[in-house]
Amino acid sequence: MEVIVIGSGVIGLTSAWYLAKEGHTVTVIDRQDSSGKETSFANAGQISYGYSSPWAAPGIPLKAMKWLTQEHAPLKVKPSLSPELVAWATKMLANCNEAKYAMNKSRMLRVANFSRECLTHLRTSEDLAYEGRQKGTLQVFRSEKQLDAIQQDMKLLTESGIEHSLFDVDQCLSVESGLADVKDKLVGGLYLPHDETGDCHQFCLTLTEKAKQLGVRFVFDTEVVSLNHQNRAIETITTTQGEFKADAYVVASGSYSRELLKQVDLSIPVYPVKGYSLTLPIVNVDKSPTSTVMDETYKVAMTRFDDRIRIAGTAELAGFDYLIPEKRKATIDMVIKDLFPQAGDFSKAEYWTGLRPMTPDGTPIIGKTPIKNLFTNTGHGTLGWTMACGSGKILASVVSGSASDIKSDDLSIHRYL
């Protein structure tokens, strides 16, 4: 079959890769001049299988109200509430109970765990270089209340077969010795030994070249204008470079998937949740993270690459806005200076912002749509890098009509229709 994939971020690329591996003729179309230039460009760098959790959780509505009044809170909401945001937030609030949280987290862990297997195989078989490390994630807690709250997550991790350990402060220092000078600020941590790190943009560029060797065609600097459909099927797509025709079409356009799918009367609850990152060159290796350290209080991740640190966090509900206010810079600055004050060179700081495509239940939307030759792979939120390889392989199986390696029928758009 001929398949067109719309989007060359990490989700579109892994979709294209696994489709090509199944023997399809694949064309990837993207509006940027190369792969991974939007949400995949400077994300947190953490590949956190065990940290795969929905934001819609018990207690979040109350926490959100408190966060809105705090200077360095992990959540920000722009004053003007659009109808799309109100509808999305309403659905999210409906998922903030114990039963739905457990169901959603279980689904997310299923995809994430499968993705770990897929990435391991892909990295090994193709010898991919992306500054990858397999040294785990340490989620650090600053209060006893946070330690108590993590018990429910640990139960779900156990049920999903994901190895984890609750650490005291000394054990935290055994895996992240760079925290030694600030140990009095911590009460413990959750260690996930099988989590990984890596530069997502480097991965995208490397996989693009590998995909070309499989025969995948890339069409850059080209924006999809319309999906032309008749009799519940896509016939062609119109782009800024003319029309393209295929047997099947995959929408993997992140936060922009929602607008594309509106053209075929499909409404998906994917909202752009804005996040910020800071990249610093390392000046003191001994005072830097070894892998990923996640500050539970501020929801900020600090990830080690070869000679850089990537600090990322904040969830801002502001629509399709790419401005970087000084206040947002101040929050991620504050966290890295608080926990790893001697690690990086702030005179060479690089700031970035991206839009994470978030669903109300946290689970991505992968699979068939009511349009018979149209498929989706979107809605991964902050976990696109974590879930990319597994999601791409699931998507390829669905398009091919073959059995998926894991249960995937509850991942499609149909759960929202």
UniProtKB/Swiss-Prot annotation:
Cofactor: FAD
Domain of life: Bacteria
Entry GO MF terms: D-amino-acid dehydrogenase activity
Record's catalysed reaction(s): a D-alpha-amino acid + A + H2O = a 2-oxocarboxylate + AH2 + NH4(+)
Record's GO cellular component terms: cytoplasm; plasma membrane
Entry's family note: Belongs to the DadA oxidoreductase family.
Ligand binding (FAD): 3-17
Protein name: D-amino acid dehydrogenase
Enzyme class: oxidoreductase
HAMAP family: DadA (MF_01202)
Keyword Flavoprotein: yes
One of the protein's GO biological processes: D-alanine catabolic process
Protein EC: 1.4.99.-
Pathway(s) the chain acts in: Amino-acid degradation; D-alanine degradation; NH(3) and pyruvate from D-alanine: step 1/1
Keyword terms of this UniProt record: FAD, Flavoprotein, Oxidoreductase
Organism: Vibrio atlanticus (strain LGP32)
Annotated function: Oxidative deamination of D-amino acids.
